[in-house]
Amino acid sequence: MRFSTAFLALLSVGFSSARLQGRDQVPVALDDDHKIPGESPLKLCDGDHKDDILKITKVDLSPNPPKAGESLVIKASGDVTQKIEEGAYINLSVKYGLIRLINTKADLCEQIKNVDLECPIDEGKLDIVKSVDLPNEIPPGKYTVFADVYTKDNKKISCLTAEVRFERNSIATPWGDL
């Protein structure tokens, strides 16, 4: 569960991260046109985002890319154009390579408590700074995170995606690194 919390934190300013496959799906962006400014792997999904309730302006991760067993510091900012209330939800999917690890619909207001926010979220500027300890046991490989975030009335809050590659940590021994 700590692992999914880390991914939710990673995608926190967008209140997550991209799109769950399903109805009304918009293809994930394949180029940098939808990259969110800053030092992170976050991108907006393809499509029109002019009506999104959350306008993400910047996300920085340190370290980027994240490293298993280390603290991940997330600095994110954005603008909320409409109050976000209880009942908002996130469709979240996390894949490890081709294997789906998480495929769930979660209560947004419950999830954002992991990044020290709570509902309702009022209109205006939103800044988040959060440190998350990533478990050392994260297997090396490529993780793809998709999230689609909606209000209780099914209005789009945001649609984000991220691809994160965790590298194998080497172990120092007297005979060399393993």
UniProtKB/Swiss-Prot annotation:
User: What GO terms in the biological process aspect are recorded for it?
Assistant: intracellular sterol transport
Biological source species: Pyricularia oryzae (strain 70-15 / ATCC MYA-4617 / FGSC 8958) (Rice blast fungus)
Family matches, as Pfam families: E1_DerP2_DerF2 (PF02221)
UniProt KW keywords: Lipid transport, Signal, Transport
Q: Which SMART domains match?
A: ML (SM00737)
Q: What is this protein called?
A: Phosphatidylglycerol/phosphatidylinositol transfer protein
Q: Please name the SUPFAM superfamilies in this protein's record.
A: E set domains
What's any one GO cellular component for it? Answer: fungal-type vacuole lumen
| Residue span(s) of the pro-peptide | 19-32
Q: Give the family from UniProt.
A: Belongs to the NPC2 family.
Gene this chain is encoded by: NPC2
CDD domains per UniProt = PG-PI_TP (cd00917)
What's the stated role of this polypeptide? Catalyzes the intermembrane transfer of phosphatidylglycerol and phosphatidylinositol.
- Where is the signal peptide, in residue numbers? 1-18
Summary of subunit composition and partner proteins: Monomer.
Q: Would the keyword Transport turn up in this protein's UniProt record?
A: yes
Highest taxon in the source lineage: Eukaryota
What Gene3D superfamilies would the database entry show?
2.60.40.770
What are the protein's GO molecular function terms? phosphatidylcholine binding; phosphatidylinositol binding; phosphatidylserine binding; sterol binding
